[in-house]
Structures are given as C-alpha cells and as structure tokens.
Amino acid sequence: DGRGWPAQVAARAHARSATAEMHSGFGALRTQLPMNMRRTPDAYRWDASADRDIARIQEIWRELRAQHGAGGPFLCGAFSIVDAMFAPVVSRFLSYGVAMDANAQAFAEAIQSLPAWREWCAAGAAELEYLEGTERFRA
C-alpha cells in the first residue's frame, strides 16, 4: 500500500533505489567501521575504499535532499523507510568521527532528534556484552 515510502512517485522511486544500494552495498564501510553505538571517536583511520563508500553515501543524501527533501528534515522530506535504512550509517559516522558535509550533518541531526534514535542509543549504551574476536573496535 506504499506506507513508509514517499507519496510522490519520483521520490518513492529514488528512495527505493537508495534503499537497495544501502542494502547491498558499502562493504568497506560495514567491514572497517562496524556498528558499535558505545564507541567514541578516536585516532582509528579507515582506508580509501571506506572513504569512497562515505563519499557515495553523502552524495546519495545530497541528491535525495536536494530533489525531494523540501518537505522536512529527512532525505525525502518526511521520515520514511530510506531514513531508517541509513540510520545505522549515521551511527557509524558519529562513532568513528567521520567528517560530514553540512547536508549530511543536517540529516544526522534530524535522525538524532527522533525518540526512537534516543531509545536505540540508550539500549546500545546499556549493552554489556563484548564478543572477543568479533567486536574489533571496543568502546
């Protein structure tokens, strides 16, 4: 029935495409900047392949916001599935101190303003389990 996606056809198609790219791509980002909401930025530095993923993600965010984001602070204006798909990337960018352009920073702030985000962060902070050998970058 389309709920969760932008109502406008072009915005919905663009959001679905970005969601598919997020789902299937960005392997270097996923490998080198694993999600850990307890982590705080430090001197760790990733390689050029992760930099390319970071640049592509910020490009996607710029395109979506420029073409479809006039109706609100999220990628296609109002919060939608595409925003939820990129929320873990916001977490990674914050946890690793990734430099964000003004557009990416605005999107990250919009995500951080969500009650669900704050709840997610609190749950992550309360997590005590540490899996030796799988959690390469301990908080």
Question: Which ranges hold each PLM region?
Answer:
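Short, structured loop/turn "capping" segments at alpha-beta junctions
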Residues: 26-30, 57, 64-71
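GST-like domain detector, emphasizing the conserved glutathione-binding G-site
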Residues: 1-47
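All-alpha amphipathic helical-bundle segments outside canonical DNA-binding/catalytic cores
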Residues: 4-14, 68-81
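Aromatic- and histidine-enriched alpha-helix N-cap/loop-to-helix transition segments
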Residues: 10, 24, 52, 79-85
